[in-house]
From Swiss-Prot:
Residues 1-25 are annotated as: Disordered. The lineage of its organism: Bacteria, Pseudomonadati, Pseudomonadota, Alphaproteobacteria, Hyphomicrobiales. It comes from the Bacteria. Residues 1-23 have a biased composition (Basic and acidic residues). PANTHER family: RIBOSOMAL PROTEIN S15, BACTERIAL AND ORGANELLAR (PTHR23321), SMALL RIBOSOMAL SUBUNIT PROTEIN US15M (PTHR23321:SF26). Part of the 30S ribosomal subunit. Forms a bridge to the 50S subunit in the 70S ribosome, contacting the 23S rRNA. The gene is rpsO. This is Small ribosomal subunit protein uS15.
């Protein structure tokens, strides 16, 4: 269900702005998107896992808040991010 350290490092390298960037909204959204994707796959086999479903809704809400922040600050950056991650909006 959770992402591996190697995958998280790869996501950070892929979405960071500079060499020391690990916490920008883009990186956080990319990591949350990966976790959401993993949980969505989990529900294909465990449809009645309501405890995890609540966690999924929390992750989606957190990602939505970060995306709203990016959109408020820079619309072009927001559009590029959702296109790169394949998020529909």
């Amino acid at each position: 269900m959770s992402i591996t350290a190697e995958r998280k490092t790869a996501l950070i390298k892929e979405h960071r702005k500079d060499a020391k960037d690990t916490g920008s909204p883009e990186v956080q959204v990319a990591i949350l998107t990966e976790r959401i994707t993993n949980l969505t796959g989990h529900f294909k086999t465990h449809g009645k896992d309501n405890h995890s479903r609540r966690g999924l809704l929390k992750l989606v809400s957190q990602r939505r808040s970060l995306l709203d922040y990016v959109k408020r600050k820079d619309e072009a950056r927001y559009r590029a991010l959702i296109e790169r991650l394949g998020i529909r909006r």
